[in-house]
């Protein structure tokens, strides 16, 4: 028997990511599922834990970690609520603004609580971001193409934005392409972050994919990561749940918990 299991609340348990995460937690010997947050009328399985409609109903729940796999419009409020009530948020929802992330980090320090916002929980995607940060030192001309299922609400993806932010730390911002470049269709060249172009693709059949394409005189370099199903995110989610128990402030990016 394993003592001191980490007690986890899952918000957004009815989504594809959420339902996969619930099964991972139920099967993990060191985790204990203690509550679910979502619409009760959507519950079709028999769960042995309480299901709540509103986060306020969880104020007195005994838990360690709040796993949030909801939607961009509620994830910030959920993470703040978790910290406010002594739970460590592990958030896989993307779409946070820089200001929202900064406010949550500040609040977590005040509460001395660990936490994690991860643009991507797939370990390969985290490595892709780190490899891109290294490559851009030598290939400063770069564009990002991110591809996701057509149910994804935010664009560009949090992974693409995080990748660009990391590369911007090593790359001088500059215009990429012809100086007199003109778009015959608005948006044809994609979004711009620090002079880097980001292109978003949304199609049925996809899960989560990203290419970082570097170009230089006479050569090119392409880095790519593919998540073929949502099981690819479970190792990172489990790692995040364990690691937030060991820190006293919220971290932005799973790389903070890897030996990179």
Swiss-Prot record:
It comes from the Bacteria. The active site is at residues 148, 152. Pathway: Amino-acid biosynthesis; L-lysine biosynthesis via DAP pathway; (S)-tetrahydrodipicolinate from L-aspartate: step 4/4. It is an enzyme of class 1 (oxidoreductase). Belongs to the DapB family. Keywords: Amino-acid biosynthesis, Cytoplasm, Diaminopimelate biosynthesis, Lysine biosynthesis, NAD, NADP, Oxidoreductase. GO terms for molecular function: 4-hydroxy-tetrahydrodipicolinate reductase; NAD binding; NADP binding; oxidoreductase activity, acting on CH or CH2 groups, NAD or NADP as acceptor. It catalyses: (S)-2,3,4,5-tetrahydrodipicolinate + NAD(+) + H2O = (2S,4S)-4-hydroxy-2,3,4,5-tetrahydrodipicolinate + NADH + H(+); (S)-2,3,4,5-tetrahydrodipicolinate + NADP(+) + H2O = (2S,4S)-4-hydroxy-2,3,4,5-tetrahydrodipicolinate + NADPH + H(+). Pfam families: DapB_C (PF05173), DapB_N (PF01113). This is 4-hydroxy-tetrahydrodipicolinate reductase. Its EC number is 1.17.1.8. PROSITE patterns: DAPB.
